[in-house]
Amino acid sequence: MVQLSRRGLLQKTGISAIAATGFAGCLGRGGGSLDSVTVAYVPIFPNMQHYVMEQEGYYEDVPRDVTVERFSSGPSVVKAFASGDVDVALFGITPAMVLADRGKEAGILAANSKNGFKIMGTTELAERYDQDGPATFERFEQEKGRKIRFGAPPDGSVPDIVLRYWIQEDLGVGEMASTINKSKVPPARAVQTIQSGDLDATIIQEPFATIIGQDERFGELAWSGDILSNHPVTVLFASQQVLDDSELAQSLVEQHTAATQFTAESPDTAAAHAASVIGSGVSEELATTAMDSQASDYISDPHAITDQATTMSEFVANVGNIEQPVGTENLFAFDPYDAIQE
């Protein structure tokens, strides 16, 4: 059974934070198996499986009551997950690394998406990069008297890590801080910010990359799948209590895998589901167009992202969001996925 968001329910009934704590306790957060499970998600395109699972009724087949809760950002999910308010989350892999680094007993059950960004810039910059490649950065600064202005989410976020890898490892043009002028711009604001002329470039996910690409003033410099091939974007992350309940964990992965298959076979319908849940200016037409992008790449197999997760973890540690790189054994829970493959 899929229920209303607990947060929305509490707001509607005016229950205090103290009562909320008691209510959470009633949902089986003590020892033993869970009677219900709270699934948190961030409303972004890379979490496509969630929209399919919710709209197609796949959560109904999970053998526990499912409560779905929407969060505005990865950090807000990290806080809720760390405090035990949610059991399962669909969010970026770097927030999962932060939780693992903090000692939270949990693991990645499935991958959601990979290769999910495009580096978009002004037509002038895109043409210059096409011609000059890595030398673009130095020549731009020589001619303009300033560094390229890049918009990206906060340090240590998935797109930030991919951007760092591109500049420092793929292109080898130096440390990011000395190569570009980075502004912290959330994905939802990137389109407006670059169109207003405040940015020269941005690293952006779908469907925002499609919006920018439809404007003749802008072009594509690079696709993240060519920068760090098969890098993860978002994941399905579960608490230890979920992992200990093999029936529940396997069911979540089974429904997730079914949603990935549904997305591959019926991309237009999946796009419509995403648009209906995300809202915020994401129309069905835009979502459908964005599904044709290289940056719309959905998977479930957690084994497919382990190598690049290790690489990304090193960068997250260098940024300072985690104390040291998180090992695969401390980040992934492969058994439920492997069990349903047998």
Question: Residue ranges of each PLM-predicted region?
Answer:
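N-terminal secretory signal peptides and thylakoid transit peptides that target proteins
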Residues: 1-22
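Short, well-ordered beta-strand elements
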Residues: 32-44, 64-70, 147-151, 181-183
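Conserved C-terminal helix/tail region of periplasmic/extracytoplasmic solute-binding proteins
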Residues: 313-342
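Secondary-structure end/capping motifs
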Residues: 244-322
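Short helix-initiation/N-cap motifs at beta->coil->alpha
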Residues: 45, 68-79, 91-94, 175-196, ...
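Pocket-lining segment of extracytoplasmic ligand-binding domains
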Residues: 186-276
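Short, polar/charged alpha-helical segment
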Residues: 43-71, 75-76, 97-102, 161-170, ...
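A conserved helix-loop-strand patch within extracytoplasmic ligand-binding domains
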Residues: 112-183, 240
